[in-house]
Amino acid sequence: MMHQMLNKKDSATHSTLPYLNTSISWGVVPTDSVANRRGSAESLSLKVDSRPGHIQTTKQISFQDQDSSSTQSTGQSYTEVASSGDDNPSRQISFSAKSGSEITQRKGFASNPKQGSMTGFPNIHFAPAQANFSFHYADPHYGGLLAATYLPQAPTCNPQMVSMIPGRVPLPAELTETDPVFVNAKQYHAIMRRRQQRAKLEAQNKLIRARKPYLHESRHVHALKRPRGSGGRFLNTKKLLQESEQAAAREQEQDKLGQQVNRKTNMSRFEAHMLQNNKDRSSTTSGSDITSVSDGADIFGHTEFQFSGFPTPINRAMLVHGQSNDMHGGGDMHHFSVHI
């Protein structure tokens, strides 16, 4: 009965721990109690910090069953270390299940039951845990886990790599029709209306005209002709027209101002030249300017014109009157003599 219970425990341990392999050594073990192993051994260890200086007790329970054909041993050890005088005692529990044809080391533990518990920190060796299992990839496009059907050959990795964020996974080439399609909220009603209309036409077996392309050719040509900025964006034509008109108005104003300035400069130059001439005349004149006009026919008589240094409206009128007399006179030409 006891043998059957041990076999059940042994099989349960084999089924629950298929990928863990650890070894525990407690202090010095006599060499005569160690034999060659002929099978695989699986063990599990759970360690919690043990504090030195406390009373420690060790319990060991071992069972042995020998068969007539070969010597087989199945051992189960239960070790408990307890500390007294503390509300939260630290414990160290280790249990192992060994199968196959091997000789247990209970003699060493029986001879020195407290040899390993005298030190606060026993020598425990842990083999690296290895587990092979597949996991799902996280796809940012879906915002969740990608189904396993899209990944027929899921790779295996160590448990240390589980916490690592996987890279981007490409979406499947063929998506099912049941997948949701996200559209703009403002376009939803129009899209549904067009779909219903298309479904009605298909049910009536009516010819459906070819769907228009997204961008008409004329719009494409117009877009090519439109002016673009440095970044490739379209420029506003209204603003361009306003800016061009403003620039033209500014140019006209500048031209007008330039013409006015030129006129002023020309007038100032002319006035300066006239003043210079008048100064020269005044310096060379000894008396008054006398102008006499004589007519050979003596029809109009002698007329004398006196001009001052500066032309006046009266002198101009007299000059014009003399010219008119010359034009209407029927005799000889008038002779003007000016004494300076």
From Swiss-Prot:
A motif (Subunit association domain (SAD)) lies at residues 182-205. Residues 60-77 have a biased composition (Low complexity). It comes from Arabidopsis thaliana (Mouse-ear cress). GO terms for cellular component: CCAAT-binding factor complex. One of its GO terms (molecular function) is DNA binding. Heterotrimeric transcription factor composed of three components, NF-YA, NF-YB and NF-YC. NF-YB and NF-YC must interact and dimerize for NF-YA association and DNA binding. The keyword Transcription applies. Residues 212-237 bind DNA. Ubiquitous. Stimulates the transcription of various genes by recognizing and binding to a CCAAT motif in promoters. Pfam families: CBFB_NFYA. PANTHER family: TRANSCRIPTION FACTOR NF-Y ALPHA-RELATED. It comes from the Eukaryota. Its main location: nucleus. Belongs to the NFYA/HAP2 subunit family. Keywords: Activator, DNA-binding, Nucleus, Transcription, Transcription regulation. It is found in: Nucleus. Residues 78-103 have a biased composition (Polar residues). Residues 43-116 are annotated as: Disordered. The keyword Nucleotidyltransferase does not apply. SMART domains: CBF (SM00521). This is Nuclear transcription factor Y subunit A-3. Transmembrane segments: none annotated.
